[in-house]
Amino acid sequence: MAMNVSTTIGLLNATSFASSSSINTVKILFVTLFISIVSTIVKLQKSAANKEGSKKLPLPPGPTPWPLIGNIPEMIRYRPTFRWIHQLMKDMNTDICLIRFGRTNFVPISCPVLAREILKKNDAIFSNRPKTLSAKSMSGGYLTTIVVPYNDQWKKMRKILTSEIISPARHKWLHDKRAEEADNLVFYIHNQFKANKNVNLRTATRHYGGNVIRKMVFSKRYFGKGMPDGGPGPEEIEHIDAVFTALKYLYGFCISDFLPFLLGLDLDGQEKFVLDANKTIRDYQNPLIDERIQQWKSGERKEMEDLLDVFITLKDSDGNPLLTPDEIKNQIAEIMIATVDNPSNAIEWAMGEMLNQPEILKKATEELDRVVGKDRLVQESDIPNLDYVKACAREAFRLHPVAHFNVPHVAMEDTVIGDYFIPKGSWAVLSRYGLGRNPKTWSDPLKYDPERHMNEGEVVLTEHELRFVTFSTGRRGCVASLLGSCMTTMLLARMLQCFTWTPPANVSKIDLAETLDELTPATPISAFAKPRLAPHLYPTSP
């Protein structure tokens, strides 16, 4: 049952997280807007009441919206919005609610049963995506796959990805490039030990992911000269920082996404962050793509070496290039943005949790010694036999998701989820945070416990029952779950097999507090790594 305005305001005051310096300006704008169209509001309310009376099922519960603008004042006032939404659902004791932002129905879900209704039973209905500034910027004008509305362009690009780019055969073809970056990870961490430095696990994990994708796409690790110790140079740091900025603001509750007439005013500052981050990513990548296209045109390049070559050489039925340069550039940018975050975030958190529970760290290392031994380095071929290591990663995905919500699924027609009516155009989002921590699904949900995943046969990182979200599922699910699983497992396995990890000197316990406006550790996790294998097994060059 929807709450009245006074109840809602009381709830908001109780769950306030932060205030923006621009609140007063925005409030004035909304008050002026409200006064100027009061007569229209009355008409809309009457129309909505008549329409509501014709429905057989109620809308999901939620806060009473203000006329026309919905709950945008609350969205602005109580930043970060995702924490306000999760607290709202907790206080309402509901696994589904409906929050009105402008004319958009935002429907978060934190129950696996309802999540499966959306992405399995009603997958075809919820296959669309919303149009927002962040999605348009990431996709170069909706030329790619992940954030593109359900249309012919999406069908074309997804078919190319699944058949030519992310296929099992292509994954096998690119194995050696991934292996090079697993070796470079060990080289980099070993050099931190030689220099008597702690390892910044955020730096190590994020740049391992960036290195893997750059090597698979461009056959190179560095945009610049790189660093002698195998770590990122200034160019790679700027590039990866831009990737994570683009991710932070993707569907980030930007005001103009819900009130499009405000686009360009950048009232909450998000528009500049989005545009600048996506420009930085392309400033590094596009010159390499242009150069490679010219090499193929001139005949200088004749053999395929990486994914960029595959994109460029794809032909249509008439023998013409299947993709335009803009499609290639933007799809590669989207691949970079979409593949680095999940593995790096999960393993930074996993290492922090395991450092605070050394018995888990010990058990995972013992599994590696038993399955792989100490006479060679762990390889991708070992992954099927490393169930406990995978359980450690899987538990990090559950407890510490990289994003609060998954990418929105827009209803293409009126439908029913649970016992609630969901109008056409609603944004249904799975709460990654809420699903993974739902006490109705998980016992002791805030405890990091890999053992909870060890009684299900072979451990995998995918979760098709949607008890939590790793790579999602359905026709709009991640097409690169095999790649993501390999990157995640190899990252953790190499770190555990090759080094003994301890907290930094004078630190007895790793701080696992979350950043307020993200789900990353508030302080990047650092630890000291000591080699535990024979010296000849450690790579000696980047």
UniProtKB/Swiss-Prot annotation:
Domain of life, per lineage: Eukaryota
GO biological process: cyanogenic glycoside biosynthetic process
GO terms for MF: heme binding; iron ion binding; isoleucine N-monooxygenase (oxime forming) activity; monooxygenase activity; valine N-monooxygenase (oxime forming) activity
Tissue: Expressed in the epidermis, the next two cortex cell layers, the endodermis and the pericycle of leaf petioles. Strong expression around the laticifers among the phloem cells and in parenchymatic cells between the protoxylem and the metaxylem cells. In the leaves, preferentially expressed in the mesophyll cells adjacent to the epidermis.
Top-rank EC class of the record's enzyme: oxidoreductase
Pathway the protein takes part in: Secondary metabolite biosynthesis
Lumenal-side segments: 43-542
Keyword Transport: no
Note: The synthesis of cyanogenic glucosides is mainly in the top of the plant and then cyanogenic glucosides are transported basipetal in the plant to the tuber.
Protein's UniProt name: Valine N-monooxygenase 1
Gene: CYP79D1
